[in-house]
Amino acid sequence: KITGLPTTVEVATAKQVEDALAFGVDVLWVGARTTVNPFSVQEVADALRGVDIPVLIKNPINPDLELWQGAVERIARVGIKQIGLIHRGFSAYGNTEFRNVPMWHLAIEMKRRLPELLFINDPSHICGRRDILQGTAQKAIDLEFDGLMIESHIDPDNAWSDAKQQITPERLAEMLGEIRWRKEDVPSEE
């Protein structure tokens, strides 16, 4: 809260939800390894009952849209109104160009099923490395995702986790400036 910027954190248990709420976190997200387990999602959902906070839900690590949609339904059933989706790619066996294969067709299908939800893309987790981040972010924008979730660190090589997929704040600003945004804000008629 020192910076005045909104904060967000991943939650996987009721205790983590309680702690995040106690510390005034602005947005919560359910991670891919939690989304894959309906019992874990229900635990998080139960902890959110009666709370008014935006919740983002990452796709499960395996390519199963029913699990993803089920997580959305569980969170919605406890009264959460502001729900969004995060596409972070899916695990695949063997060597691929990506850390998590995008399987864009599955993301598009999920957007078709739940068009009213905010839908953002996490190219950091899809790529797992910096050198293909820009192209993947651009593809997400070309596919009309509503936004991007990109990991940034002042010293990426020394980050405690996922160091290879993080970029500096300066590189993030540069990348965002290079993206060709497809949607333009339409001025309101007042």
Describe the function of each predicted region:
Residues 1-42:
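Active-site beta->alpha loop and helix N-cap motifs at the rims of alpha/beta catalytic domains
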Residues 1-9, 44-54, 104-119, 165-187:
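Alpha-helix-loop-beta-strand connector modules within alpha/beta enzyme cores
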Residues 13, 33-34, 60-62, 126, ...:
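Short beta->alpha junction loops/turns
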Residues 139, 151, 155-160, 169-182:
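Histidine-acidic metal/acid-base catalytic patches
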Residues 40-155:
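Catalytic alpha/beta core domains of metabolic enzymes, predominantly
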Residues 27-38, 143-165:
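Glycine-rich phosphate-binding active-site loops on the catalytic face of alpha/beta enzymes
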Residues 85-91, 163-172:
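Amphipathic, soluble alpha/beta structural segments
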Residues 9-20, 68-74, 180-190:
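Electropositive, surface-exposed helix/loop patches at the edges of structured domains
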